[in-house]
């Protein structure tokens, strides 16, 4: 059994200001050190992460006193820098491994003995440091009529930079040929809004107080790569920079082949297709469908829109709660479990998947050489 020691140290401070429960401010800071980064060599082990927030409880102002239905209303804003060291330990060090493949081709003689050759698998980068996220947030919240109606609204922007990235490249064969190294390179941003609407109340039920509440929340967020180490020879439509972090790489369907003549005059992938098969777009116009015609399209597999409903009630020592969540505005590649269908109890997505007993509705409406229109 191997025991590995690790160590991290952090210093935290928080300063709060409250004037008449009307003007609020808070300042926090963290000074953190992590063993995962080089210390004595580059001084990248330690980093400072400050944040600040302010709020104005506008409902306390005299000019709001006539609005008796308003329980509380607050306007707020915040900015902060967050650090992340969730990376592999010692990624800043060089690593080596034995050359595999043909042993005779990767052997050398040292002091009269045949030795297996070593090569550098990762080149050291002692400047590796923390991943940083700069967050901006502005919003407001209020409650009315003793809690009968409440609302929270926030708009946010997150800018993440210095993301640890495996960088590829080449160097002279005398050093081993191909290599990769880690660097703080990638940049991603995310922006969106969050809304929560709530209701709570108390009633008298059978001589005992009955309380209940409900809240609905909705979040919309969209991300993209601001910088990604795309290879110089990567075609424009396959680059990650400027696109969603989880965007899929796919061929673009132009419809279905309607006739043998259309197949003869079109580009296609692999073996000759049949009438009724999918027709893909030849993005680079070279007269064939290959990997260079795959492009990054659509959204990622994480919902851009999430929503939820929370319900709760309590009476006479009993309480009950329920939670419902959902997501929308995301894309899923129909492969793996989604392709097989039966792994997750969904309807089959392929009419003739590996001899599966597919639903009649899919068989009846599937394209065929006799009827490529997908409808009979």
Predicted segment positions?
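Hydrophobic, lipid-facing positions within transmembrane beta-strands of outer-membrane proteins
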Residues: 9-15, 31, 48-56, 73-75, ...
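Flexible, surface-exposed loop regions and adjacent strand-edge segments
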Residues: 42-51, 91-99, 168-177, 229-239, ...
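Solvent-exposed loop/turn elements at secondary-structure boundaries
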Residues: 4, 65-132, 150-188, 235
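Transmembrane beta-strands of outer-membrane beta-barrel pores
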Residues: 29-35, 58-60, 79-83, 155-161, ...
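Short loop/turn motifs that connect adjacent beta-strands in outer-membrane beta-barrel proteins
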Residues: 22, 59-73, 145-148, 202-212, ...
